[in-house]
Amino acid sequence: MKDLINLFDQLNWENADNYPEGTFKKTLRDEDGAKTILLKMPAGFRMELHSHITSEQNFVLKGAFTYQGFTYHEGSYQHFNAHEDHGPYYSKDGALVLVIWDPYKPDE
């Protein structure tokens, strides 16, 4: 069993590479091809159309963002399959999102 991590005391916010300037992350898990992060979107956040080689799940913890004309508020959930295009995203006031990428499976 892994040790419990106190996210706000033991993990620092880092610049989120490949995201717009001012976006930060806390990496909760990065093992065996799977990754989980807390993503802090700044006010005015915008990310264009993109895809990933693995599936992605998003759960809004705080704030909101807009995707394809629908606003995802606190408690909202999204799932995208591997190679599925998604975006653009926009957050007027910023958001805190739990993002989970599943392990890469070459046969997907």
Region spans (language model):
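A short, N-terminal "cap"/entry segment at the start of jelly-roll beta-barrel domains
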Residues: 1-33
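Conserved short histidine dyad/triad with adjacent acidic residue
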Residues: 22, 29-51, 66, 81-85
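Glycine- and acidic-residue-biased ligand/ion/polar-headgroup-sensing regions
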Residues: 53-67, 74
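Ligand-binding loop in jelly-roll beta-barrel domains
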Residues: 82-107
